[in-house]
Structures are given as structure tokens and as C-alpha cells.
A protein has these predicted regions:
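Buried hydrophobic residues that stabilize the cores of well-folded domains
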Residues: 21-135
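Bacterial Sec-dependent N-terminal signal peptides
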Residues: 1-25
């Protein structure tokens, strides 16, 4: 039981540290990009794979995120922001770099009011509206 508690505690601490690490990049305008690689050992043979690439703008917003699976592109997203740092556009690309779908966002008073998803031909796939109740 004590081992289980210790394991849970270590997991929580590591999770908080990794979360804080990601937040630092968001708040620090000095980070331009981050590349994460992983080394795996199989029968004493070292294999190194790129795990992810993340690029930031001068304000610390993520502008591009590429994740890899065994060294090959798995997911690829690009993001655009308005002057208030609200995400206004998100594009998803396939492994070959072709646009799969894109989303556009609208805001009022800093609150997201609409999300429209388009296919690769700019045809609307879905539209979501957000209605807020305020005090």
C-alpha cells in the first residue's frame, strides 16, 4: 500500500512538473521552438525517434505542433491568433502535409462564441455556437 501511495505521489509530481514546463513555454516569449526526442533500447540497440516539434510566436502562443509516431508524422497542426491571443484558426494536416480540415473561431469580449469546421475543400462540416450566462 505504501508503494502504491509513493507511486501515485511521484506520478502527480511528475505530471505537475511537465504541466508547468509546458506553461513556461506559453508565458515565455523567448522560446521559438521545442523538439522532443526519445531514445528506446531494444535488445541493446538504441533507436532514437523524434517525438514532437512545437513552434511558438513571440507572444508564446503555439503556432505549429507536429507529433511523431516511431519517427513518422502522426499529427500536424498549425494555429493563428488575433491581437488578443485568441486562437482564430486551426489547421490539421495529414502525414504528407495536405490540409485535412480547418477550424475558425470567433470571440466576443474574450469569450469564444463560434467554431466552424471546414473540410479540405472549405466546405462546412460543422458549426458550434457558445452562449454564456453571466452574473
Amino acid at each position: 500500500m505504501k508503494t502504491l501511495r509513493t507511486t501515485v505521489l511521484i506520478t502527480l509530481i511528475l505530471g505537475a512538473a511537465l504541466s508547468a514546463e509546458g506553461q513556461k513555454a506559453k508565458s515565455n516569449g523567448n522560446v521559438k521552438s521545442l523538439v522532443v526526442s526519445e531514445e528506446k533500447y531494444d535488445m541493446l540497440v538504441k533507436k532514437q525517434y523524434k517525438e514532437s516539434e512545437t513552434y511558438y510566436d513571440i507572444k508564446g502562443n503555439i503556432t505549429e505542433n507536429i507529433s511523431y509516431k516511431q519517427g513518422k508524422v502522426n499529427k500536424h497542426f498549425k494555429y493563428e491568433y488575433d491581437s488578443d491571443n485568441n486562437k482564430i484558426r486551426e489547421q490539421e494536416f495529414d502525414a504528407s502535409g495536405r490540409l485535412k480540415e480547418s477550424s475558425e473561431y470567433k470571440y466576443e469580449n474574450g469569450l469564444r462564441t463560434e467554431k466552424t469546421v471546414y473540410d479540405s475543400n472549405k466546405k462546412i462540416k460543422s458549426k458550434k455556437t457558445y452562449v454564456y450566462t453571466t452574473f
